[in-house]
Structures are given as structure tokens and as C-alpha cells.
Amino acid sequence: MKTYQVFLGTNKPAGGTVSTQEWLTFLKQIDAVFTGYTVETASGSWQGIKEKTYILTVITDEIKQLIRIAEDYKMIFNQDSVLIQELPVKPLFV
């Protein structure tokens, strides 16, 4: 299994941001695919513009499902891009 982080910005190109309710609704899509994950709230910047960002961390072998979630987020919230990074760590569940 590998550890991935997905960076989900909340600024919308037409103005406004992803609301708390919109985010909670989107989380249901993640719940339907992954039984465990962590979400952190961060301050990010994309092309010089500051924005609230959610960082989704998942330990999985299902990278295709993670990419699908990122693509869905990008489409639903009209994002320019969504960053997925693979972390160089080996998870150990005790």
C-alpha cells in the first residue's frame, strides 16, 4: 500500500468558494470508496492566489479510484487542476 495526498483547493474560477455544505456532500463520494482517510484544512496558493485547501490523505493500492475522485472534484467545482502526490513513506498499522 502507498500513501497519497490530494490537494483540493476551494476557490471557484467564477468567484466564490466551495461551501462547507458542498464539501460535506463531496465527502460522501470519498466515503463510498475509501473506508479510512484523513482530511486536513490548510492555507494554499495557486498561481499567486491564496485559498483554503483540503488535504486528503489516503493509504491505498487503489490509485485509479483516487484519480477518479480528484477528477470528479475538478469537474464538480470547475478547478484548473487537483494535485495528487505519492509520499515516500511506508505505513505501519499497529
Write out the residue ranges for each language-model feature.
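Positively charged, small/polar-rich N-terminal and surface patches that mediate targeting and assembly
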Residues: 1-94
